[in-house]
């Protein structure tokens, strides 16, 4: 039936190593690694993945849910189950990257009724100047004409 050469070539082709596709730059979809532009309108499009996974606060910080918070919860201890439901803040570099992926509409402050994040839009007890997306100084409360030590002693933002 089979000659020895035909049988050996058949076995050799069966045991040939399988080439596995590596996720290099050529295999990453184009929308994942660059800012997209709408061809009809001719302006930048917001990255939908960022809108789905992150929330931008009115002070310019981005927050996101704890990764893996719904995975194998029954195996985790109670402390992890409690803290995994918290939101995490992004670093300064991450916030800058996320701002570049968004359009100016999403960088403006948003005011929603019954916003669950309303307590987090104002940063408390931070002495550094607050700057909005245009570089303008932003105040959380009305300016009081007194020195900072007196205002910190008698006036609280809480």
UniProtKB/Swiss-Prot annotation:
Belongs to the bacterial ribosomal protein bL35 family. This is Large ribosomal subunit protein bL35m. It comes from the Eukaryota. The gene is mrpl-35. Keywords: Mitochondrion, Ribonucleoprotein, Ribosomal protein, Transit peptide. GO terms for cellular component: mitochondrion; ribonucleoprotein complex; ribosome. The keyword Membrane does not apply. The keyword Mitochondrion applies. It is found in: Mitochondrion.
